Amino acid sequence: MRLFLSLLVVVLSMVLKGPTPAQGVPDVSNPFDVLEEFGKTLEDNVGEFINLITQSELPAKTRDWFSETFRKVKEKLRINS
């Protein structure tokens, strides 16, 4: 599910970004060159997206919230037992 959402975000960003002037007129001399260029662009965009996620505070906050909630549940179960 996460991979699907990540790919969806990358594809949407590429679509919304639109073609740059150098990409305005595609050269169709070799379809594999176009595919290779798309792969490199996709790799760069996914790399940027992963860096954005890893530098975000959201994963740390989520991990802290789960740890705190789990600790509270353990304490309640320990008190009731």
From Swiss-Prot:
Keyword Ribonucleoprotein: no
Alphabetical UniProt keywords: Lipid transport, Secreted, Signal, Transport
GO biological process: lipid transport; lipoprotein metabolic process; negative regulation of cholesterol transport; negative regulation of lipid catabolic process; negative regulation of very-low-density lipoprotein particle clearance; triglyceride metabolic process; very-low-density lipoprotein particle clearance
Major subcellular location class: secreted
Record-linked Pfam families: ApoC-I
Top-level taxon of the source organism: Eukaryota
Any one GO CC term of the record: high-density lipoprotein particle
GO molecular-function terms, A-Z: fatty acid binding; phospholipase inhibitor activity
Residues making up the signal peptide according to the UniProt record: 1-24
Subcellular location: Secreted
Remarks, miscellaneous: Apolipoprotein C-I is present in acidic (APOC1A) and basic (APOC1B) forms in P.paniscus, P.abelii and P.troglodytes and perhaps also in baboons and macaques. The two genes for ApoC-I arose through a duplication process that occurred after the divergence of New World monkeys from the human lineage. In human, the acidic form has become a pseudogene sometime between the divergence of bonobos and chimpanzees from the human lineage and the appearance of the Denisovans. Pseudogenization resulted when the codon for the penultimate amino acid in the signal sequence was changed to a stop codon.
Family statement: Belongs to the apolipoprotein C1 family.
Protein name: Apolipoprotein C-I, acidic form
